[in-house]
Amino acid sequence: FEDVYYFFKDSMGYDITFLSSQNVGNNRYDIFIDNLPTNYFAITYTTSFINQASTSCGSYIKMRNNYNGAAFQNITEQENIKITAAHEFFHAIQFSYNCYERFWLMEATAVWSEDEIYNEINDHYRYMPSWFQNSAKPIDDESSHMYGSFIFFQYVDEHLGGYETIKNIWERSRSNANSVNDVSFTSINEALESVGSSFSSALNNMRIANRIMSSHPNADPFTYLEAESYPVTGPLEIAQLYFEDQIIEYSQNYLAVNSANYIKLDLVAPAKISISILDGYVDDLFHAIVFKHKDRDAWTIRSGNNFNIDPSIGIDWATIIINSQSQNQDRWSYKTKIESGISEELIVNNTYPNPFIKNENEFISRFISTIDQNINISIYNILGKQIFKHKLVLLSGEEQEFKWNLKNNRGNKISSGIYFFEINGQNERKVKKVTILN
């Protein structure tokens, strides 16, 4: 427990002053060893309020007296004690920040914390198979599902500010604490806004990363460092839609708030895919198609309501992702329609995320060609003035990256705003609108 104490205090910077507040003159935290119920690793109990606003609680921990049961056999007894100490002491910190915070946020971040200090143990993998089989459950579901929701905070940790952002979530929770309202999503959103993101954006990105499930740099920012070690390859796909030449319609009558559906696509001919909302606001749902290119570590992500996919480019797998991203209602229904699409000689990945934030000072788009051709790229500002141009030579079956350093033809940095990309190939012209933010 001393290792855990110093890790959270010194390495991660959490406020540990609650020790002296709850044990005046003692400055020690109470930990007991007890004969706990089967399958309980430990229990953290709250005591009295320790601040004037009555939102911060003292606590103590009961550890079990042995880890011999079947639930603890994946790792050694010493490893069980280590990850349990991390998990439960993080609960003690959480109670001292906001005694009223929701259990899902407490448990998901406590599981996340285990891997921060004891990265080599990986006992938290145990929660992943069930969680990935149940993506249609809300991320804040407070059954055992909430333990697997650590994956959201793992994504935030790896891509949106590291452990400092998780700490900031708890600092916001402490500031927002009250006994009446759910402040978990407000606190998460405030912390993510401080790093140029939001809860909705992070949730959408995590849903994509969960399907790609790779650590390969080509998939960035939809990666996990330990993806290849995870005991899952992706979420459960609730339906498989096979398209050859007949129109297909698939409806889903219930999608809960903060949950997602994954739908497998099996295409043997060019397909036009449309997603329409039957119940709920259009902007409340995020839609994307993710597909992996055959025989290479490359993925394409297209967001929106209407897509054209030509499988002749070579697709290993393709999945529709539909994620609810609003707190304004609690259920949605939608319909997916697949009909004959068009063959494509030039494929330009839709920019995602859009708006694009200039934190990397480089804009990247990918182009795929099914023939040998020259590509001319022109970028225009909102006034219609050309500010940049570039040429690419693409070979049949080749994918190339177009990298733009966000400078105009004169070498000056561009300002935030809306820009239009005109892409002219041998026989096709495409226009993409991109919002770029400082």
Predicted regions and their residues:
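Surface-exposed loop/edge segments in extracytoplasmic proteins
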Residues: 294-303, 385-391, 429-430
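Glycine-centered coil/turn sites that cap beta-strands in beta-rich domains
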Residues: 341-381, 389-404, 425
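Juxtacatalytic substrate-recognition/specificity segment
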Residues: 1-102, 109, 119-123
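Beta/coil-rich, acidic/histidine-enriched accessory regions frequently appended to metallopeptidases
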Residues: 175-343
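A glycine-anchored, Pro-Gly-centered beta-turn/N-cap motif
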Residues: 314-316, 398, 415-418
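C-terminal tail/sorting-segment detector
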Residues: 410-412, 416-438
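Signal that preferentially marks extracellular ectodomain short beta-strand elements
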Residues: 68, 308, 402-414
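Acidic/His/Gly-enriched intrinsically disordered linker/tail segments
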Residues: 49-56, 79, 83, 98-160, ...
